């Protein structure tokens, strides 16, 4: 089996020649090569320049030996394309004019990806050409709740109290906004598939801010809408991932995604009963493990692999969240080697 097949086979619940591995945020600040590119342009310019986005997307494939590339972009380019003013600087992402009610939401439009998000699609085409089938390419978007949280709050937050209060207090506003975002995301993801993406990941970064009962209203149903909005004959797998979602895993599995990402707080063999047998699992090494001495890192990688073996079904090795900016590159390489080496035969 070739390196190109591992990731897709695992997403389908099959057993490849070895466990595939990639890392969320694998194209990022921990790589000197990324920092060299980033030093020349702003973050948003990097996202919107297809040649540069393609360059940094490809870096970890060659440097680390991972089994999938994930497009370098940002989840917030979609709200911007819908009509919001986005500022990305050292203070983090900001919407200076956040949504304050239904009237603001009605001014948002569903963008035409071929026109308003063309830079993303052009980057996908460039990456596909350079990869030449070496490994699959993952496209992505943010989940409706996570995007709505940013759009109402105006910036990142620990609790997103303004967004939660606004959506919980006004059901028509919540439904209208989340429905419009879902429609935009379905079109955006389908355009990524049409441009050549081999798989998709939906990031619900702030899923854990909601109680399970609220997530059942504001979160999972709208991810399901996005998945259902893709072409029914699609063959590319869809991954869904959220942070602090131990109590939400069953809901994530119910969205129709082919793979459920698990953060490091829930062992994979404990996640399996919550997810059920149908979906593959992705995860879930604590990102801090990549700072440990090699023997300790090896022990933690082996533990994840052992938990995945006990869980059964397909498994894509990943971190339980994004790779941290000060991660030693050599340790990230070692983790990839250890995953590929696998566990001794029983």
Residue ranges and their predicted role:
Residues 1, 50-51, 114-117, 175:
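Generic detection of long, well-ordered alpha-helical segments
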Residues 42-44, 50, 89-91, 95-98, ...:
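N-terminal/domain-start segments enriched in small and hydrophobic, helix-friendly residues
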Residues 42, 102-112, 167-174:
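Short glycine/proline- and acidic residue-enriched helix-loop micro-motifs
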């Amino acid at each position: 089996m070739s390196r190109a097949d591992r990731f897709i086979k695992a997403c389908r619940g099959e057993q490849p020649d070895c466990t595939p591995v990639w890392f969320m945020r694998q194209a990022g600040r921990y790589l000197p090569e990324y920092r060299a590119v980033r030093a020349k342009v702003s973050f948003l310019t990097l996202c919107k320049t297809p040649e540069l986005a393609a360059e940094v997307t490809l870096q970890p494939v060659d440097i680390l030996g991972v089994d999938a590339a994930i497009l370098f972009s940002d989840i917030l380019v979609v709200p911007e394309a819908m009509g919001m003013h986005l500022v990305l600087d050292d203070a983090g992402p900001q919407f200076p004019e956040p949504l304050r009610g239904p009237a603001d939401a009605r001014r948002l439009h569903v963008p035409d990806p071929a026109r308003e998000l063309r830079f993303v699609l052009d980057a996908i085409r460039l990456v596909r050409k350079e990869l030449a089938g070496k490994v699959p390419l993952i496209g992505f978007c943010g989940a409706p709740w996570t995007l709505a949280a940013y759009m109402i709050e105006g910036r990142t937050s620990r609790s997103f109290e303004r967004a939660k209060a606004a959506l919980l207090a006004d059901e028509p506003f919540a439904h209208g906004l989340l429905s419009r975002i879902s429609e935009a995301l379905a079109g955006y993801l389908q355009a990524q598939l049409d441009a050549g993406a081999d798989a998709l990941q939906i990031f619900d970064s702030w899923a854990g801010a909601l109680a399970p009962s609220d997530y059942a209203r504001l979160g999972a149903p709208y991810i399901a809408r996005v998945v259902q909005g893709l072409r029914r004959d699609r063959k590319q797998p869809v991954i869904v991932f959220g942070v602090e979602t131990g109590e939400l895993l069953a809901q994530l599995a119910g969205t129709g995604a082919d793979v459920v990402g698990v953060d490091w707080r829930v062992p994979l063999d404990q996640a399996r009963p919550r997810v059920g047998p149908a979906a593959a699992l992705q995860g879930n090494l604590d990102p801090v493990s990549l700072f440990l001495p090699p023997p300790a890192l090896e022990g933690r990688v082996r533990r994840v692999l052992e938990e995945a073996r006990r869980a059964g079904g397909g498994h894509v090795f990943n971190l339980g969240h994004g790779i941290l900016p000060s991660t030693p590159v050599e340790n990230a390489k070692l983790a990839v080697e250890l995953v590929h080496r696998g566990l001794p035969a029983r």
